[in-house]
A protein has these predicted regions:
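Peripheral (non-transmembrane) domains and long loops of multi-pass membrane proteins
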Residues: 1-89
């Protein structure tokens, strides 16, 4: 249940929100999870590394399915990703 995963991840200190959360299986049958994680804008690199570790630990501790491949994109609160038009102009 991705809503349950999102709720757990959003309870990690310094995490403001989680969006674009996707879970799937690659052709080899390996489960994977990807998410954009909005974090407090004034975080240090050490704090960001700690958040990444806590995100991994959360998945391992709270969910029965082992997810060996995860990708978390950390975004500072207030970040606006460029639109497709901006990327291709």
């Amino acid at each position: 249940n991705l809503d349950e995963v999102r709720t757990h991840l959003e309870n990690i200190p310094h995490v403001v929100a989680v969006h674009d959360l996707h879970a799937s299986t690659v052709s080899t049958g390996m489960p994977m999870l990807m998410a954009h994680v909005v974090v407090e804008p004034d975080m240090s690199m050490d704090q960001a590394a700690n958040v990444l570790s806590q995100l991994q630990d959360c998945l391992r501790e709270h969910f029965p399915v082992s997810i060996p491949h995860t990708t978390f994109q950390l975004e500072p609160q207030g970040y606006r990703s460029p639109s497709a038009e901006q990327l291709h102009s």
